[in-house]
Amino acid sequence: MKVLFAKTFVKDLKHVPGHIRKRIKLIIEECQNSNSLNDLKLDIKKIKGYHNYYRIRVGNYRIGIEVNGDTIIFRRVLHRKSIYDYFP
């Protein structure tokens, strides 16, 4: 799948601890190598009430993604207590 990054995702990534950042890098690589969301062996859940928005769980952090066809847009990465205030 094609992977894109929002400016807010890159900005959020600077504030994430190093060990979580390493796990996120592996997740991004796995997304690039997969053909669909179903191929990913990640903790992905659809955001209720939104058609194309999902979250990926990484420890106490959540990655907010948008899926359009074969493109994944990484929108936000925030702590679990604040992700749903800013995403989607």
Swiss-Prot record:
Pfam families, per database record: ParE_toxin (PF05016)
GO molecular function: nuclease activity
Keyword annotations of the record: Hydrolase, Nuclease, Toxin-antitoxin system
Record EC number: 3.1.-.-
Residue stretches spanning the membrane: none
Effect of residue 62 to K/S: Inactivates toxin
Domain of life, per lineage: Archaea
Broad enzyme group: hydrolase
Family: Belongs to the RelE toxin family.
Subunit and partners: Forms heterodimers with RelB3 and possibly a heterotetramer RelE3-RelB3(2)-RelE3 from 2 heterodimers. The heterotetramer is probably not very stable in solution.
Annotated PANTHER family: PTHR38813, TOXIN RELE1-RELATED
Role of this protein: Toxic component of a type II toxin-antitoxin (TA) system. Has RNase activity. Is very toxic upon expression in E.coli. Its toxic activity is probably neutralized by the cognate antitoxin RelB3.
Protein's name according to its UniProt entry: Toxin RelE3
Organism expressing this protein natively: Methanocaldococcus jannaschii (strain ATCC 43067 / DSM 2661 / JAL-1 / JCM 10045 / NBRC 100440) (Methanococcus jannaschii)
Classification of source organism: Archaea, Methanobacteriati, Methanobacteriota, Methanomada group, Methanococci
